[in-house]
């Protein structure tokens, strides 16, 4: 979990920008979106295989 402490004389916008950058860097939001709905292992393998095929070509 990302934690951002607002510094002295720092605007909320700057703190929010730092928080968003930290969340993006750790991949938290992508992980949440990925786990929003259950995905069967067979579907997960199929997607992984298709992604590898796309990278190759």
UniProtKB/Swiss-Prot annotation:
Pfam families: Ribosomal_S21. It comes from the Bacteria. The keyword Magnesium does not apply. Coiled coil: none annotated. Keywords: Ribonucleoprotein, Ribosomal protein. GO terms for cellular component: ribonucleoprotein complex; ribosome. GO terms for molecular function: structural constituent of ribosome. Belongs to the bacterial ribosomal protein bS21 family. This is Small ribosomal subunit protein bS21. It comes from Geobacillus kaustophilus (strain HTA426).
């Amino acid at each position: 979990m990302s934690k951002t402490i607002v510094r002295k004389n720092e605007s909320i916008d700057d703190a929010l920008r730092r928080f968003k950058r930290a969340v993006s860097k750790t991949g938290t939001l992508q992980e949440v979106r990925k786990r929003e709905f259950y995905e069967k292992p067979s579907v997960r393998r199929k997607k992984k295989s298709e992604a590898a095929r796309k990278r190759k070509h």
